[in-house]
Amino acid sequence: MQNINPTQTAAWSALEQHKADNLNIPQLFAEDANRFDKYHLNFEQQILVDFSKNAINQKTLELLRQLANECGLASATEAMFSGQKINRTENRAVLHTALRNRSNTPVLVDGKDVMPEVNAVLAKMKDFCERIISGSWKGYTGKAITDVINIGIGGSDLGPYMVTEALRPYKNHLNMHFVSNVDGTHIAEVLKKVNPETTLVLVASKTFTTQETMTNALTAREWLLAAVKDESAVAKHFAALSTNAKEVAKFGIDTANMFEFWDWVGGRYSLWSAIGLSIALSLGFENFEALLSGAHAMDNHFRTAPIEKNIPTTLALIGIWNSNFLGAETEALLPYDQYLHRFAAYFQQGNMESNGKFVGRDGSPVTHQTGPIVWGEPGTNGQHAFYQLIHQGTKLIPCDFIAPAQTHNPVGDHHAKLLSNFFAQTEALAFGKSKETVEAEFVAAGKNLADVAEIVPFKVFTGNKPTNSILVQKITPFTLGALIAMYEHKIFVQGVIFNIYSFDQWGVELGKQLANRILPELQNAEKISSHDSSTNGLINQFKAWR
């Protein structure tokens, strides 16, 4: 990948000047009755992305596309797909796209085609899923598996949990449970719900040394052995998603039930790999394959569609415009689908761990904004929580509204009411409500303007708040796969233009290092004085209270 400071490009300078045009969303619509037709894109007639309610015009998009070209987006995209080691700080390729490469076109890393290994793991996952789901796999007392606990953290938890929740209408009889936090409460509450005779535990850790995951895995192992008192039972109730065969065998897991992945799979992009075994178990392997197919279709779109028609690139460029030129610091992901209640949390990690960097690819601090703060909750819940600030606060918060046209649960008029709110919110954010409209409403209600003059300013909405509307025909494994891949590629595009490395995460290391130093200090009653006064005081109070 090239090392290009975006702020030194001609396009960046032109965008800085263009910012002075102070584009206004209501005015842009007033000037162009066909604005929607020009500012939306459609993916396979299943996902419609409307970006017309942003403060952009044709000039904005042309300059943003010029910025992408000047920053070498096209060559960076090919570098990723072709297996070049674009994760330079860890000297790794970035090939989550190969995991869902349904075409089987060879993908080379260091001259070796990775697809035979990818397909071998998928075949192994399929066979395992069929045995568990059919009931032919038996636990230590001869009973079939009814519950699956996935123990992992970060990408080994967030992705599988998000997808199994999002696709709950497709789930089979297996009950899925997810444990991530090293807080003993998390695993204790899950173990209360399950029977050791009929429970399968998946331990998801590439190295099989991750502190949180292995602490929880050992607790689950002790729980099983407390019931059966026979170490051979571990092999019938545990499987590993790992690459460390030695540690897996030492734990008591049969390495035949170890599902591998590779160092070119980043944790937050790993649900497509063996880490997705819990997804395949919950939904059935054919639905897992459909998820992969949807992502692969979006990969093909991203790789081949011209920049003017490219959905992930367009979303990425608009995001850069909003953050670096219009001053937005956050992005809200607002799915109007209760099944997608973990979608924002998933891409909170996906975006903030990828692009939350202050050092450019040249090793120097950047002078521009990089990744935004990403957050959100499902609609309509959020409307009664934080939308107040989005509508009338002093922060500019671009929002992505996501909704399915078809619901899995056609109960009464629930879905029509849900979608009426979905459509209304983006209209309200874009167009607001003027002082004149507020006054006219009071008059229509029979009020005397003199009597309500004091209240009028509080009912004004300025509008001009940017949103994208993403309307999905129906949330299926295919469309969810495409939707996830769309956001993955958006993050990639922004990282390329920000001139940062999106696929490392050194920011998680310092806290872990310090925690490893502090842990031994907590295992005695001695007063601590080895840290700053704040940390010493907190540790000593903890010791006094425990």
From Swiss-Prot:
Gene3D superfamilies assigned: 1.10.1390.10, Glucose-6-phosphate isomerase like protein, domain 1 (3.40.50.10490)
The keyword Cytoplasm appears for this protein: yes
GO cellular-component term (any): cytosol
Catalyzed reaction equations: alpha-D-glucose 6-phosphate = beta-D-fructose 6-phosphate
Pathway: Carbohydrate biosynthesis; gluconeogenesis; Carbohydrate degradation; glycolysis; D-glyceraldehyde 3-phosphate and glycerone phosphate from D-glucose: step 2/4
Single GO BP term: glucose 6-phosphate metabolic process
Principal subcellular localisation of the protein: cytoplasm
Active site, per annotation: E353 (proton donor), H384, K512
Record-linked SUPFAM superfamilies: SIS domain
Its job: Catalyzes the reversible isomerization of glucose-6-phosphate to fructose-6-phosphate.
UniProt similarity note: Belongs to the GPI family.
HAMAP family for this protein: G6P_isomerase (MF_00473)
Protein name, entry field: Glucose-6-phosphate isomerase
Gene source species: Actinobacillus pleuropneumoniae serotype 5b (strain L20)
